């Protein structure tokens, strides 16, 4: 059934909700994925953030998974009516989901969209698949690292391969914690948002950590605090994002770095697609924005992969918004509406239909699911 309405894209991040219209190059709106409540009212996004001192703040998405549906509904309502100024019943809604989103969560997303917001059709897709679309390819392996969740997901011909998908035990919030500890060691006890700002503006990935950490000529960078005090930060700037590559050195646990996690994921896929995956290693999400990460990833994978392997790291300048942009691109394909689940299907088959559609797609790629 063809639906003559526009489509909107919502990327549901643990830290930030990004919303906008299909065909646009960037989200129309970005706001914190938080709900603030007092005795009488609730506030969403930036308004909740600005009143955080007098509100109880709630975060409905934890480590990429929606855990509070009432508050998530408030965030979607805010995105539709306040940020985009649209009526959801007049728009197809494209939604991102965590690579390891439980089936019951996917059904709940569909239920709220159709029964509460009366949207005519939806499309729910793995965040990593959207990131692949933004790379201009249909096959590759994605490292998506946001504020509270990181995943490695191989994608073959537009379909994520779940048996080789992994969730990493660290993300941007953990890097912020690490930066806070490093700054505390220097005698700076700073608010978390200031620490996060330092991390995002000044940190970088070292090309050779063991050498640079012992190099006395490493130059520090200055940062002006809100009170006007200027502090100088040195090795902490590259020690913080080193968590991505050497998490076990910081957390004391048996965690793989992002390069080793990508290698392990590829090794779980059939041999005949290894070169395709190595040929499009896609970096996605805000925690992949550190300068130097592209070279370090290439260096790490070169040491792990067979010597004749061609490795291509795809680090788009706009990769912080890769998921949203990929959803926007999807909405432009000629048969987009045929891929959607419409209200008629939902009314006939119920919420479980969204999982039946996903299973059908996976069955068409069964040949690439076997482990080596």
Swiss-Prot record:
Keywords: ATP-binding, Cytoplasm, Cytoskeleton, Hydrolase, Nucleotide-binding. It catalyses: ATP + H2O = ADP + phosphate + H(+). It is an enzyme of class 3 (hydrolase). Its EC number is 3.6.4.-. It is found in: Cytoplasm, Cytoskeleton. InterPro entries: Actin (IPR004000), ATPase_NBD (IPR043129). GO terms for biological process: phagocytosis. GO terms for cellular component: actin cytoskeleton; cytoplasm. GO terms for molecular function: ATP binding; hydrolase activity; myosin binding; structural constituent of cytoskeleton. Its main location: cytoplasm. SUPFAM superfamilies: Actin-like ATPase domain. Actins are highly conserved proteins that are involved in various types of cell motility and are ubiquitously expressed in all eukaryotic cells. Multiple isoforms are involved in various cellular functions such as cytoskeleton structure, cell mobility, chromosome movement and muscle contraction. Belongs to the actin family. This is Putative actin-27. The gene is act27.
């Amino acid at each position: 059934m063809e639906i003559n309405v526009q489509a909107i894209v919502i990327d549901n991040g643990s830290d930030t909700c990004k919303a906008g219209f299909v065909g646009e190059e960037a989200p129309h709106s970005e706001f914190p994925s938080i709900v603030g409540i007092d005795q009488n009212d609730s506030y969403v996004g930036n308004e909740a953030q600005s009143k955080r001192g007098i509100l109880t703040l709630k975060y409905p998405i934890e480590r990429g998974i929606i855990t509070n549906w009432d508050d998530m509904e408030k965030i979607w309502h805010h995105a539709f009516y306040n940020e985009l100024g649209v009526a959801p019943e007049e728009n197809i809604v494209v939604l991102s989901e965590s690579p390891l989103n439980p089936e019951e969560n996917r059904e709940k997303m569909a239920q709220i969209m159709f029964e509460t917001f009366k949207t005519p059709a939806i499309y729910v897709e793995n965040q990593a698949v959207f990131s692949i679309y933004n790379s201009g390819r249909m096959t590759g392996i994605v490292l998506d690292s946001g504020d509270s969740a990181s995943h490695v997901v191989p994608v073959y011909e537009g379909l994520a391969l779940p048996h080789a998908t992994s969730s990493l035990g660290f993300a941007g919030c953990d890097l912020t914690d690490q930066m806070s500890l490093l700054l505390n060691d220097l005698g700076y006890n700073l608010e978390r948002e200031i620490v996060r700002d330092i991390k995002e503006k000044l940190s970088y990935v070292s090309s050779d950590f063991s050498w640079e950490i012992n190099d006395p000529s490493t130059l520090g960078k200055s940062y002006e605090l809100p009170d006007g005090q200027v502090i100088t930060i040195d090795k902490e700037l590259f020690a913080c994002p080193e968590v991505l590559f050497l998490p076990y050195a910081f957390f004391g646990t048996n965690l793989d770095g992002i390069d080793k996690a990508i290698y392990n994921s590829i090794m779980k896929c059939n041999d005949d697609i290894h070169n395709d995956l190595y040929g499009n290693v896609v970096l996605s999400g805000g925690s992949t924005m550190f300068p130097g990460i592209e070279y370090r990833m290439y260096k790490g994978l070169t040491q792990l992969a067979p010597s004749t392997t061609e490795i291509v790291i795809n680090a788009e300048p706009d990769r912080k918004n890769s998921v949203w942009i990929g959803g926007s691109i999807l909405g432009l394909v000629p048969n987009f509406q045929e891929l959607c689940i419409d209200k008629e299907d939902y009314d006939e088959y119920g919420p479980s239909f969204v999982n039946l559609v996903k299973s059908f797609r996976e069955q068409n790629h069964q040949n690439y699911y076997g482990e080596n």
